[in-house]
Regions:
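Flavin (FAD/FMN)-binding glycine-rich loop and adjacent Rossmann-like elements that form
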Residues: 1-171
Length: 171
């Protein structure tokens, strides 16, 4: 809640204590851990043009990375009920995409999508119904997460908790 103090001008952004762990999602359907790995964004097109240079200030991510969860909401398009999206098309920003794009994380998301589709058919539930009342608990979402974990597709790293701020061992 210290962010409100920044908005009101009581403290500077530099005075905030930055989180030492990734965001925890109640609708997690998988996990990943990979360094941010940006491909260069070139000034001119085609990118192979001799003498072409990276666009200044475009690469970020020189900081530490932490394990992260894959939220189901990132797989559900806002206007299409009968589709789950994973892989390079998952709904993440370009910073997150630099880590999501590797195979092991795409496999985790793909396994989650397949399990979610099967679960939805078995229970007569649309995937969006599993997340529409977040952060409130949803019994069907909890059942899906139990199935994912039982199938060997974990939804959280050991000791994942909003109270655990010591993720230094995971860097």
């Amino acid at each position: 809640l210290r962010t409100i103090d920044v908005i009101r001008g009581k403290i500077s952004p530099q005075e905030l204590q930055w989180r030492s762990r990734a965001h925890i999602y109640p609708d997690s359907v998988g996990i990943g851990h990979y360094n941010l790995d940006f491909h260069p964004c070139m000034v001119e097109s085609p990118s192979e043009k001799p003498g072409n240079q990276e666009r200044p200030g475009e690469r970020q991510g020189a900081d530490e990375t932490y394990p992260f969860q894959i939220p189901l909401r990132a797989m559900i398009p806002p206007k299409i009920d009968n589709l789950l999206v994973t892989g390079k098309s998952i709904a993440v920003d370009h910073v997150s995409a630099s880590a999501y794009r590797v195979h092991s994380i795409e496999w985790s998301a793909g396994a989650a999508a397949g399990t979610t589709a099967s679960f939805a058919l078995e229970t007569g539930t649309m995937p969006y119904q599993l997340i529409e009342n977040l952060p409130r608990a949803n019994a069907n979402l909890e059942q899906l997460q139990k199935r994912l974990n039982a199938n060997g597709n974990p939804t959280a790293f050991p000791n994942t908790s909003i109270l655990n701020l010591n993720w230094k061992d995971w860097r």
